[in-house]
């Protein structure tokens, strides 16, 4: 059965059962904390959290998902994929356990001719949570599943939560037995290679409290509305129904492998593991890259763009290592389109753009590889010739800085050459470069440090600023500069990611140049007449010698020639947001002085669309009441709809009027004054502002903090950003109130009660944990091993034991071992990934040269930690839990040598 048919049957099955088919969300959501959508239920989270009311009681979808943390494992095993499809059915307060089990079982076991998948019921198993007898009953009732094919499992396997307070509940997983050729019998508990999970049914029935792990949280009580969230792995089902061992053999990925195998001199599945890995990398990454590009991402150096760039570059390099020297990306993207577009038609509709972006990255990276590979080979040879096994940080930095090699590529190439890389040295050099770049950027922003190139234009006279009266102005290009050098013409290069600093100097401009805390306007410059095809985005505007406007641009089409007439146009939405932020800053300043008094003097500010930051001289933090008063006074002034107007006057007259000036700032003899509401606010200011205070919109103070001795900072949102912030907080409060089952006004008291209960529970847990450890200590003393004439207790204790508890326990155990030479070494997995360990040595063992402070060093080396102490008692802590057994073995070996 083809994968598209598997997907279609899933949706058809649930639509017939009264579910609404919900299309897959984009893999890119408007959430900065989520790089890519990585689970089928992500788009439904607001409904499960009670933040939004679902428009349906039942829904079904097949979601595109991307997971890239294990990108380096792709291809090495057949289990890891960066893209997968998760089919899911969801119930929002409608059916529950019985319905979920019945729907899943019916689809899996119904004959193919009846619309099902036709799985043999005798080869299906289920797992349930330890005490979920209800689910067991339904598996027997609905599916006729015998008890011997239903296994109970703990919280780590069969209890679901989102990792934060909110809905949680037991889950039930469905497994398929692939047969004895894949491993021993005994169900999922015995062998998950033979028994492969294909569907997970989550029964959201409880609320969970705080906790830091999958198991460390309190179950608070039942949910008012029980929900269902399920996930069926489409690719896993495809493997089983197509009779293949892994997803790379399915109809989704095998075509890409076959494409490359028809070109490469070495084939797939010929017994060369490294080649097979490269084939699988190409197949997996090409599909994921096409999906990401299709959802609007372009290759870049940060975030999602960087992930995409890395995927594409790994494809290209894997192909090179297989002996494919010619471009291959265009054909790969076409192969992905053919395989995936039956399910995702947007891949066909937007194919030209997807292919163009992928091919452009291939072309650019081929140049990078050609120039950088020789340097890497030379550096690797020199490293080995010197007897070293680690490529220097300087070499890795040069590859990155000069040839564009990402560090991950250098790491891969080094590993293939049996070398490691000095990553710490590389990152130190990168940090130095960033610092230099920051300093250079600051110099360029402050004054275009080298004015010689601009001197002629500076001497010719200032740019006429028209932005107080209009947002679009016709202007003449006085000069064009690329990286500080004057040129007669600049054109669109067609090269993505060009880094040249291109600036236009115009005789007049509506763009506000960054100054006075207000960031520069953004917008466009377009050609006129014969140059009407010329268009550029204005991304920044800086002043040169305080008189000349330098417009930083990205040329998008055509060419600009010195002397041309152009139209400079400010983005009106950007300007409106900037004026809201700047006027809001004046309002907050006035409110601060009204609440705190005249000593609250401005020390600096920053305002941009929707946001303001205001620094002022003040000793000590503001009280909550002062913050509330400042916010209230500001919003009262907004509501008053004060008129905002500006005028120019002599500096002395402005000061006599009471206009506020920034201390230490040099002002000309004639200054611009901005007045809001008569006496409410009067400041010297050259920035852009709203026409009335009501246009600022609501002002929400986000916080107040210290930024230096005697200087405090207030940050706030204004306008729509303020509304969005308040709406988000309201939704969070509603979610909390819903989760806690109390009205919003009672949330603080309820939280305080829960915190107190949690503390009491933690104390009781600590008591029980220590009691259990003491019991284990008694048994440990009785079972001490004899190494030479030294009795040794070297034991791993239960997780969660603190260093203080271990010290108490080693003393108790040592006391039970008598006066013969004895050593006690205890180690445990503590909180926050720590690994505490303690060693105690009695006097008789010390007489034989055994010292506790020496033994903790041995243990520390095994767990990436260190310790110290005295001859009789020493302790330490590490971070490598994987080394605990090695630490205990090292102690035994050390005692054996004593």
Swiss-Prot record:
CDD domains hit by this protein: AlaRS_core
Catalytic activity entry: tRNA(Ala) + L-alanine + ATP = L-alanyl-tRNA(Ala) + AMP + diphosphate
Cofactor: Zn(2+)
Pfam families: DHHA1, tRNA-synt_2c, tRNA_SAD
Gene Ontology BP annotations: alanyl-tRNA aminoacylation
Alphabetically ordered keywords of this record: Aminoacyl-tRNA synthetase, ATP-binding, Cytoplasm, Ligase, Metal-binding, Nucleotide-binding, Protein biosynthesis, RNA-binding, tRNA-binding, Zinc
SUPFAM superfamilies found in the cross-reference section: Class II aaRS and biotin synthetases, Putative anticodon-binding domain of alanyl-tRNA synthetase (AlaRS), ThrRS/AlaRS common domain, Translation proteins
Textual note on the cofactor: Binds 1 zinc ion per subunit.
Keyword ATP-binding among record annotations: yes
Top-rank lineage group of the source organism: Bacteria
GO CC field: cytosol
Binding site for Zn(2+): 582, 586, 685, 689
GO MF entry, a single one: aminoacyl-tRNA deacylase activity
Subcellular location, principal: cytoplasm
Annotated localization: Cytoplasm
InterPro entries in the record: aa-tRNA-synth_II/BPL/LPL (IPR045864), Ala-tRNA-lgiase_IIc (IPR002318), Ala-tRNA-ligase_IIc_anticod-bd (IPR018162), Ala-tRNA-synth_IIc_core (IPR018165), Ala-tRNA-synth_IIc_N (IPR018164), Ala-tRNA_ligase (IPR050058), Ala_tRNA_ligase_euk/bac (IPR023033), DHHA1_dom (IPR003156)
E.C. designation(s): 6.1.1.7
The keyword Transmembrane belongs to this UniProt entry's keyword annotation: no
Family: Belongs to the class-II aminoacyl-tRNA synthetase family.
HAMAP family for this protein: Ala_tRNA_synth_B
Annotated function: Catalyzes the attachment of alanine to tRNA(Ala) in a two-step reaction: alanine is first activated by ATP to form Ala-AMP and then transferred to the acceptor end of tRNA(Ala). Also edits incorrectly charged Ser-tRNA(Ala) and Gly-tRNA(Ala) via its editing domain.
Domain characteristics, as noted in the entry: Consists of three domains; the N-terminal catalytic domain, the editing domain and the C-terminal C-Ala domain. The editing domain removes incorrectly charged amino acids, while the C-Ala domain, along with tRNA(Ala), serves as a bridge to cooperatively bring together the editing and aminoacylation centers thus stimulating deacylation of misacylated tRNAs.
Name of this protein: Alanine--tRNA ligase
Species the sequence originates in: Mycolicibacterium vanbaalenii (strain DSM 7251 / JCM 13017 / BCRC 16820 / KCTC 9966 / NRRL B-24157 / PYR-1)
Lineage: Bacteria, Bacillati, Actinomycetota, Actinomycetes, Mycobacteriales
């Amino acid at each position: 059965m083809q994968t598209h048919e598997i997907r279609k049957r899933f949706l058809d099955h649930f639509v017939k059962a009264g579910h609404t088919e919900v299309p897959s969300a984009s893999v890119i959501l408007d959430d900065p904390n989520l790089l890519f959508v990585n689970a089928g239920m992500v788009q439904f989270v607001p409904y499960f959290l009670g933040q939004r009311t679902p428009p349906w009681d039942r829904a079904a979808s097949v979601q595109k998902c991307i997971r890239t943390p294990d990108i380096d494992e792709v291809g090495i095993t057949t289990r890891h994929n960066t893209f997968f499809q998760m089919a899911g059915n969801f119930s929002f307060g409608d059916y529950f356990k019985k319905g979920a089990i019945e729907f899943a079982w019916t689809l899996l076991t119904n004959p193919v001719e009846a619309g099902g998948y036709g799985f043999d019921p005798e080869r299906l198993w289920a797992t349930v949570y330890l005490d979920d007898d209800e689910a067991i009953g339904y598996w027997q009732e609905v599916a006729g599943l015998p008890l011997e094919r239903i296994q109970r499992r703990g919280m780590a396997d069969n209890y679901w939560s989102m990792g934060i307070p909110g809905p949680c509940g037991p889950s039930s997983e469905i497994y398929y037995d692939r047969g004895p050729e894949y491993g021993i019998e005994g169900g999922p508990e015995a062998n998950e290679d033979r028994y492969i999970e294909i569907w997970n049914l989550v029964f959201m029935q409880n609320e969970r409290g705080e906790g830091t792990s999958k198991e460390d949280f309190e179950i608070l009580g039942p949910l008012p509305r029980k929900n269902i969230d399920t996930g069926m792995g489409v690719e896993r089902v495809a493997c089983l129904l197509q009779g293949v061992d892994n997803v790379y053999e399915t109809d989704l990925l095998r075509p890409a492998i076959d494409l490359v195998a028809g070109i490469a001199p070495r084939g797939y599945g010929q017994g060369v593991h490294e080649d097979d890995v490269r084939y699988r990398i190409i197949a997996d990454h090409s599909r994921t890259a096409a999906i990401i590009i299709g959802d609007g991402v372009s290759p870049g150096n940060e975030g999602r763009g960087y992930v995409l760039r890395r995927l594409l570059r790994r494809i290209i390099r894997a192909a090179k290592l297989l002996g494919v020297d010619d471009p291959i990306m265009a054909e790969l993207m076409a192969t992905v389109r053919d395989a995936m577009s039956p399910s995702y038609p947007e891949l066909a509709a937007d194919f030209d753009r997807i292919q163009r972006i992928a091919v452009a990255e291939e072309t650019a990276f081929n140049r990078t590889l050609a120039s950088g590979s020789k340097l890497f080979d030379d550096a690797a040879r020199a490293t080995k010739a010197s007897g070293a096994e680690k490529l220097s940080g300087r070499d890795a930095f040069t590859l990155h800085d000069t040839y564009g090699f990402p560090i991950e590529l250098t790491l891969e190439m080094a590993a293939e050459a049996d070398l490691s890389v000095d990553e710490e040295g590389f990152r130190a050099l990168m940090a130095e470069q960033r610092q230099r770049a920051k300093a250079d950027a600051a110099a360029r922003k402050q004054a275009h440090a080298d004015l010689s190139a601009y001197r002629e234009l500076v001497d010719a006279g200032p740019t006429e600023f028209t932005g107080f009266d209009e947002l679009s102005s016709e202007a003449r290009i006085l000069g064009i500069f690329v990286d500080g050098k004057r040129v007669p013409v600049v054109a669109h290069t067609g090269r993505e990611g060009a880094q040249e600093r291109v600036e236009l100097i115009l005789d007049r401009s509506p763009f506000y140049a960054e100054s006075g805390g207000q960031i520069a306007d953004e917008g466009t410059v377009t050609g006129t007449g014969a140059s009407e095809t010329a268009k550029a985005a204005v991304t920044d505007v800086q002043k040169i010698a305080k008189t000349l406007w330098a417009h930083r641009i990205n040329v998008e089409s055509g060419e600009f020639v010195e002397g041309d007439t152009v139209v400079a146009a400010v983005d009106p939405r950007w300007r409106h947001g900037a004026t809201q932020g700047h006027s809001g800053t004046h309002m907050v300043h006035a409110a601060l002085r009204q609440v705190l008094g005249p000593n609250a003097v401005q020390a600096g500010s920053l305002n941009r669309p929707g946001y303001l930051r205001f620094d002022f001289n003040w000793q000590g933090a503001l009280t909550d009441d002062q913050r509330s008063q400042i916010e209230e006074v500001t919003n009262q002034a907004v509501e008053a709809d004060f008129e905002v107007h500006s005028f120019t006057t002599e500096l002395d007259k402005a000061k006599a009027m009471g206009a506020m000036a920034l201390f230490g700032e040099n002002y000309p003899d004639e200054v611009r004054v901005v007045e809001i509401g008569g006496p409410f606010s009067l400041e010297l200011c050259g920035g852009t502002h709203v026409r009335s205070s009501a246009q600022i919109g609501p002002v929400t103070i986000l916080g107040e903090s210290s930024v230096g001795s005697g200087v405090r900072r207030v940050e706030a949102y204004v306008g729509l950003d303020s509304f969005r912030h308040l709406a988000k907080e309201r939704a969070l409060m509603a979610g909390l109130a819903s989760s806690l089952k109390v009205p919003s006004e009672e949330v603080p008291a309820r939280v305080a009660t829960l915190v107190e209960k949690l503390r009491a529970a933690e104390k009781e847990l600590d008591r029980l944990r220590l009691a259990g450890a003491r019991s284990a200590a008694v048994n440990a003393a009785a079972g001490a091993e004899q190494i030479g004439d030294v009795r040794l207790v070297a034991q791993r204790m239960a997780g969660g034991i603190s260093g203080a508890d271990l010290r108490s326990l080693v003393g108790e155990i040592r006391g039970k071992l008598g006066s013969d030479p004895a050593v006690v070494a205890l180690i445990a997995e503590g909180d926050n990934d720590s690994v505490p360990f303690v060693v105690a040595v009695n006097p008789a063992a010390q007489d034989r040269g055994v010292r506790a402070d020496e033994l903790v060093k041995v243990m520390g080396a095994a767990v990436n930690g260190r310790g110290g102490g005295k001859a009789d008692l020493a302790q330490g802590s590490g971070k490598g839990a994987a080394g605990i057994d090695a630490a205990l073995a090292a102690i035994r070996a050390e005692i054996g040598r004593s």
